[in-house]
Amino acid sequence: MLRELQKQRIKAFLVAPNNPWKILVLDSRTQQIIGPLMKVSELRECGITAHFLVTQERHPISNTPAVYFVESADGVLDDVLAELYSEYYLNFATSVTRGEIESLGLGLSERGLGLRIRSVYDQFVDFIALQDDMFTLGMKGSFIEMENPDTWRRMVMSVMSVFVTLGEVPFIVATDDDVTTQMARMLETKIRNTGVIKRGSKRPVLVLVSRSHDVITPVQHVWSYSALMNDLFALESNKITLKSGKVFDLDPQDELWRRNANEYFPVVVERVEKELLEYKKEMALRSIDEKTDKKVIQEALDKAPELAKRNESVNAHISICSEMVEMIKERAIDDFYKVEKGGHTNQELIELSEKGSDEDVLRLAILLLNTKDFDLIDPLLRKRKIKSKAIEFFRRHGGTRSEKLGTLYSQVVTSLMGNVKKLLPVKEQTPISSLVETIYGDIKSQIYSGLRVFDSMGSKSIYASEISRLVVFGVGGGTYTELKTLKLLEERIGVPIIYGSTEILNAREFLRQVEGRMSLD
């Protein structure tokens, strides 16, 4: 829903100029937004014949209008003065400042070019919609910067964009935490003063959660398809690059990806292999020779584009799964996951200390904090000659932990996985999904202990009957594992959940930021 709504809003201003052909000019921020959202073919449908970055050197196309989709007015004045295009339609990712508009107007009036600017709009679409139920702000280093007031201001504008796009004024819930409380207060004020969202009969609840609430989940080994993909290949803006060099764009409209992104890896492999088998059967049934009936030939031709798309999808996921299996074997990811989630013996720990990368062992050591085996951490790290400032951070801040799960060996049958353990957890929760479940339960019970409710409409209480959806936003970064557990919660409580965060973290990136914070102390 969120992704489609954002796309509709952007398409509306792309087609707005009364001209069948136009140029699209972006900056680095809006390129981040539009890249995973719209294909080149969709831009073509909006009449976009070419698109450029505002920082690029360009030749004049003086008889063609240009639609600008930018974060700020930087570079616009130079383009108009250079008379690159016939008309300029300016659209800002959030809102343009008065100072920028005045500066632009002054510069253009001196040359008599003010009328070239045909429209200026604040669009409030400043977020990256990766899936219909997931968005990110793409703010790199947000865990390091999450206590910076300048970072809060940028977050507020982007999170507000989500609710402008949804067309709903949120109730804002902050946990007893200074960062989320300050941000909630700023967001409430901004929504009230801007007044761009109309109140409806149902409203979303925005739950702001600091990454400091749970610093363990980002370093745990993972086992669901999207989380594992992000861990192994750094899934960035729905795009991954395999070790083989192959690059894949993961389209949320791709049925295989849409159905399986949050599934456990063994289940995904089984489904992909089954899909491949079904595709081969379909192709065999549609084989054509000189004796084939004309009607059958026509049906085959009509079906060809769909089959080609299906073939591309199956082959992509086979390639991805195959390489993931090899990396799982190489680093013994299945063993690390089993030990972290299902318990372990000392012998298993000793054996595991000789497997995986140094980063895998460091992650395991962090998971042993606050357990009966904490005394094994230093010998474990010394054995691998691992030195990291991060371990001290987790000694001080490791508090909240994901619960241990019962795990079982599944009955999944798959040849592709070979001897990789086919683990399927019995249940899975994260501290954030547990927190959200508690908050929703408190709202239903009208209990607000430890919660602060902010509302630009002035209400101090929330009733479950007026909630349209829950929007959970992670300040300082989020994970695909948390998305999975929130979607499981969605099934339990029957309320739609959208998950967003300042950035999507994997263990490597989070550990890098933890070390960065330690260096600042």
Curated annotation (Swiss-Prot):
Gene Ontology, cellular component aspect: endoplasmic reticulum membrane; Golgi cisterna membrane
Subcellular location(s) of the protein: Cytoplasm; Endoplasmic reticulum membrane; Golgi apparatus, Golgi stack membrane
GO biological process, one term: vesicle-mediated transport
Protein keywords: Cytoplasm, Endoplasmic reticulum, ER-Golgi transport, Golgi apparatus, Membrane, Protein transport, Transport
InterPro entries named in the record: Sec-1-like_dom1, Sec-1-like_dom3a, Sec1-like, Sec1-like_dom2, Sec1-like_sf
Function of the protein: Involved in vesicular transport between the endoplasmic reticulum and the Golgi.
PANTHER family named among the record's database cross-references: VESICLE PROTEIN SORTING-ASSOCIATED (PTHR11679)
Protein name as catalogued: SEC1 family transport protein SLY1
Gene: SLY1
